Amino acid sequence: MKVVATGDVYGPLFEEFTKDTGVTVEVLSMSSGEVLSKLRAEGGTPSADLWFGGGIDAFMSAKDDGLLEPVMFDAAADLGDEYKDADGYWYSKGITIVGFLLNNSLMEELGLTAPESWDDLTDSQYEGEIVMSNPAVSGTNYAVVNALLQAKGDQGWDYFDALNNNIAYYGKRGSDPKNKVSSGEFAVGISYIDASIEQAAEENDLTIVYPSDGMPWVPEGVAVFKNAENVDAAKYFVEWLFSNDDHLRQLAEIEQKSGIKVIKPSIEGIELSYHPSLLMTEDLSLFGSQRTEILDRFEPLMGDKAATE
């Protein structure tokens, strides 16, 4: 079984699947935006079987394009309705939350005050000192854009025009803000927040900020590609993962995230590392339907600040 995943850390989980089923697994690391572009380019003959991780907007778009295979299993009833497709085309294995990451030394050197809210990031003191990932390739940062547009309504694009004035670089990977703030290239990163970020903060004298006006969040998807060569194995993996809490706990440990508790509240042995009230109110149905329109407008805004390699 061939898998496209958002990282190469999932080996132990897939090894457990191989141990249980005898199905060997080959993993290729790729962001959700890249997967969607590749899937469309392949014209209905996917080179992989299973899509594991990435922002749910890309999964919604893939479903609309007829590129996914539905998977139905009894344990899906234990997952929150908003975290699974009603027709079984995708399921969420957790959520990614987003906040700010500050390089304390650089902030002090530049005389910057710590931002506390999304609006604070538009202050001119941060000009050239903010980094975020390109929302066209990072599902997490697309969620930031969509969530803030929902929250700010008619003023949403004015906000991003102002924010763009302070952003120096739009990275190609979701980890770029963490890496570039940790190395001291930039003072402020708009970044996912998980245990790996907490560890980086401790090791590199960084501060994590949970925005006072709410944290954007995005469900992370799992799906099977339509017309996949090993479609039955991929469908069984989805059932295998969600039907056994031990597998979900192993996944949470690998990812160093507690978001599966939001997806499946009945799971034991996992506690959320943040209060749910910090999460922004989001209409997830808009994540997929608005994706093309939003990215078409955001791309020229980024200009030559977007990473190309």
Identify what each model region corresponds to.
Residues M280-E309:
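Conserved C-terminal helix/tail region of periplasmic/extracytoplasmic solute-binding proteins
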Residues L68-A77, W90-S92, D119, N204-P216, ...:
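Short beta-strand->loop
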Residues K2-E26, F100, A200:
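Short, polar/charged alpha-helical segment
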Residues L101-L106, N146-L149, V218-N230, Q250-E253:
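A bilobed periplasmic-binding-protein/Venus flytrap-type ligand-binding module shared by bacterial periplasmic
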Residues D57-S61, S182, A187-D205, I254:
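A ligand-binding cleft/hinge motif common to bilobed small-molecule-binding domains
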